[in-house]
UniProtKB/Swiss-Prot annotation:
This is Envelope glycoprotein I. It comes from Suid herpesvirus 1 (strain Rice). InterPro entries: Herpes_gI (IPR002874). Its main location: virion. Residues 309-350 are intravirion. It is found in: Virion membrane; Host cell membrane; Host cell junction; Host Golgi apparatus membrane. Keywords: Glycoprotein, Host cell junction, Host cell membrane, Host Golgi apparatus, Host membrane, Membrane, Phosphoprotein, Signal, Transmembrane, Transmembrane helix, Viral envelope protein, Virion.
Length: 350
């Protein structure tokens, strides 16, 4: 010990401080790891003592895939069994079924798309939230040993959890469990709990009861707050007969199989066509068509008149036609240039 202390004192102060800081920042790994054939469980402790002021009994832990690679898509079932050593039987307190579970690192039942809980009593579990055992307002009868049975990939694993609940300061809530619900143990506890009775799996295959839909009442007509009165069967039959009588038959088939139209139907069709034609030729429709046409025509005539006025103003300002001045300066073809008079310079040819 003296040699070790002497060697430590010889280390540089900076290196010693760095080693102490690294040791302080290193997370302390604690807990117990129980290995199984399909999954393993890591818990801080398989037994828990519930304090007198604790409102809930909770044992947290994580289910892990440690034996081989974790499956990419799997399903499984998780059950919570309560042991009764005095009567050598067990009671199933909780059952859950997980389906369509993806691979999330090495944790089991994380991110499953479907979960169903066909059975839930006082004790429950939520392994996807890292909760292996949960009891709300625990009482002394809730103390004892529980077994978490996990079935996945054709394997069954058992993990024992123990809860201790002191009686002082707690109300007594008796846990009802009849002798029929407590299944007897044949042989050892391990072998009996590992073999699943087909009757126990019936809870997973039985569909949940369908809740009856609430009766619907017809909505009252808009604008009134009164509820429509129920009508008798005779009134409904009379209304149906009146509707049938008012609806004309389109036609009948003759002996040759040709459709003969009913006169009332033909007259109604002709009357509808006449009304449509008359409506199209009414004064309102004609005004709607001719109105925009007249407006466009007036705009066009106004533009033509404006252009004519501009041309007239240009001619009046010059006093003569510009085209006539250009025409007068031109010399006809074949004409001789004018003879210059004495004393005037002759025009130079252009």
């Amino acid at each position: 010990m003296m040699m070790v202390a002497r060697d430590v004192t010889r280390l540089p102060a900076g290196l010693l401080l760095a080693a102490l800081t690294l040791a302080a920042l290193t997370p302390r790994v604690g807990g117990v790891l129980f290995r199984g054939a399909g999954v393993s469980v890591h818990v801080a402790g398989s037994a828990v003592l519930v304090p007198g002021d604790a409102p809930n009994l909770t044992i947290d832990g994580t289910l892990l895939f440690l034996e081989g690679p974790s499956p990419s898509n799997y399903s499984g079932r998780v059950e919570l069994l309560r042991l009764d050593p005095k009567r050598a039987c067990y009671t199933r307190e909780y059952a859950a079924e997980y389906d369509l579970c993806p691979r999330v690192h090495h944790e089991a039942f994380r991110g499953c798309l479907r979960k169903r809980e066909p059975l839930a009593r006082r004790a429950s579990a939520a392994v996807e939230a890292r909760r292996l055992l949960f009891v709300s307002r625990p009482a002394p009868p809730d103390a004892g040993s529980y077994v978490l049975r996990v079935r996945v990939n054709g394997t069954t694993d058992l993990f024992v959890l123990t809860a201790l609940v002191p009686p002082r300061g707690r109300p007594h809530h008796p846990t009802p469990s009849s002798a029929d619900e407590c299944r007897p143990v044949v042989g050892s506890w391990h072998d009996s709990l590992r073999v699943v009775d087909p009757a126990e799996d019936a809870v997973f295959t039985t569909p949940p009861p369908i809740e009856p839909e609430p009766p619907t009442t017809p909505a009252p007509p808009r604008g009134t707050g009164a509820t429509p009165e129920p009508r008798s069967d005779e009134e409904e039959e009379d209304e149906e007969g009146a509707t049938t009588a008012m609806t004309p038959v389109p036609g009948t088939l003759d002996a040759n199989g040709t459709m003969v139209l009913n006169a009332s139907v033909v007259s109604r069709v002709l009357l509808a066509a006449a009304n449509a034609t008359a409506g199209a030729r009414g004064p309102g429709k004609i005004a709607m068509v001719l109105g925009p046409t007249i407006v466009v025509l007036l705009i066009f005539l106004g533009g033509v008149a404006c252009a004519a006025r501009r041309c007239a103003r240009g001619i009046a300002s010059t006093g003569r036609d510009p085209g006539a001045a250009r025409r007068s300066t031109r010399r006809p073809r074949g004409a001789r240039p004018p003879t210059p008079s004495p004393g005037r310079p002759s025009p130079s040819p252009r």
